[in-house]
Amino acid sequence: MIVFSLLLTVQCLLAPVQTPVAFQYVEPPCEYCAGRRTIDFAQSVGQSVLAPIAGRITFAGTVVDQGYVTIDPSPGTGYGPEVLITVGGLVIDANIVSGRNVQVGERIGVSNGLIHLSMRSIREGKSARYVDPTAYLGRRRPRVRLIPYSGFGARRAQIGLTCPASFGR
């Protein structure tokens, strides 16, 4: 008997801004209990905010005086149709509208202070479940390799981008 296994990988999320995480995700004890359902980045006002993933914008608008952009990831990213990724706390660029496709790293607006990043898993017939996006953020790491001694100087190892999670696979 031959067994085949398929390893599905997901594309890492690009941090929407280039600052460290200021506030971590805090899992609420119940569906409607208090908790921090986003990770937040402290960012100077007016700095560019980038799309964390390629996909179709399903919402671009203001909620309680803050701009939010929700992206349904493209099929090639590995996330599937049940995942939505939202960036909040920004002033949205005029060309960022619902139904438009964005590329990873494309500017979607400018910071209005604290930038929020959230992930939701939506299953048919069930409430949306928030997921900690931290494990999906891309991290730079050097590739380890052995270099034989040849008397010449060593070459630098390439830097790879990795994320430790795969979404439910």
Predicted regions: what is each one?
Residues 51-92, 113-118:
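Zn2+-dependent peptidoglycan hydrolase active-site motif and core
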Residues 13, 42, 97-103, 112-113, ...:
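Acidic, glycine-rich catalytic/binding loops that coordinate metals and/or anionic ligands
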